C-alpha cells in the first residue's frame, strides 16, 4: 500500500503545511489579510473562541488566543506538514496530526443540531466531520511506511539512532 498511502500522505502534508504560511502572513485564504501571526493575529482565537456547543466549550474558550496554544498549533502545522511532504518522521507526524485533528473535532463535538444558545448548528452529519476524516486518514501513511515512496523515508531510516527508534520513522 506504499504508493497508495503516498497518494494520501502528500496532499495531507500540503493541507497542514499550507495552513502555516496562511496563518503566519494572512494570505487571505483561511486567514484574512492583516490578521496573520506577523500582524498580531492569533491562529487559535477565532476557531476556539467560536466553539458554541459541547462539554469542552469553556475549556476551548480558555485556550483561545493563549500564546502557548498559538505556538503549539503553528508548530504542529509546520512540523506535521513538512514531515509528511518530506516522508520523514511520518509516524510521529501522523500521531501529532491525529491528536491535533481529534482536538479540533472535539472542539466542534457534538455535531448537534443546536448550539448551546439554542440556535441551529448547521451541522450536516451527526458523527463524521472533516477533522475526524483527516485524523483517520493520517493513520494509513504511518501504518504503511509511505515515507519511502516519493519521500526521503529510506534515507531517514538509515540514520543509526533511528534504526533503534522505529516510532520516529
Place the predicted regions along the sequence by residue:
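Extended, low-polarity transmembrane helix blocks
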Residues: 1-51, 55-79, 86-169
Amino acid at each position: 500500500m506504499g504508493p497508495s498511502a503516498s497518494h494520501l500522505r502528500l496532499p495531507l502534508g500540503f493541507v497542514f503545511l499550507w495552513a502555516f504560511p496562511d496563518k503566519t502572513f494572512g494570505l487571505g485564504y483561511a486567514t484574512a489579510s492583516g490578521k496573520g501571526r506577523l500582524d498580531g493575529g492569533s491562529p487559535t482565537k477565532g476557531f476556539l473562541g467560536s466553539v458554541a456547543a459541547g462539554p469542552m466549550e469553556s475549556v476551548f474558550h480558555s485556550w483561545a488566543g493563549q500564546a502557548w496554544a498559538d505556538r503549539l498549533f503553528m508548530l504542529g502545522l509546520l512540523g506535521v506538514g513538512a514531515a509528511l511532504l518530506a516522508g520523514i518522521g511520518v509516524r510521529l507526524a501522523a500521531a501529532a496530526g491525529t491528536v491535533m485533528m481529534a482536538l479540533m473535532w472535539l472542539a466542534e463535538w457534538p455535531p448537534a443540531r443546536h448550539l448551546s444558545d439554542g440556535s441551529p448548528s448547521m451541522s450536516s452529519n451527526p458523527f463524521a466531520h472533516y477533522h475526524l476524516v483527516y485524523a483517520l486518514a493520517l493513520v494509513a501513511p504511518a501504518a504503511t511506511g509511505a515515507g519511502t515512496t516519493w519521500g526521503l523515508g529510506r534515507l531517514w531510516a538509515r540514520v543509526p539512532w533511528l534504526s533503534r527508534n522505529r516510532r520516529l520513522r
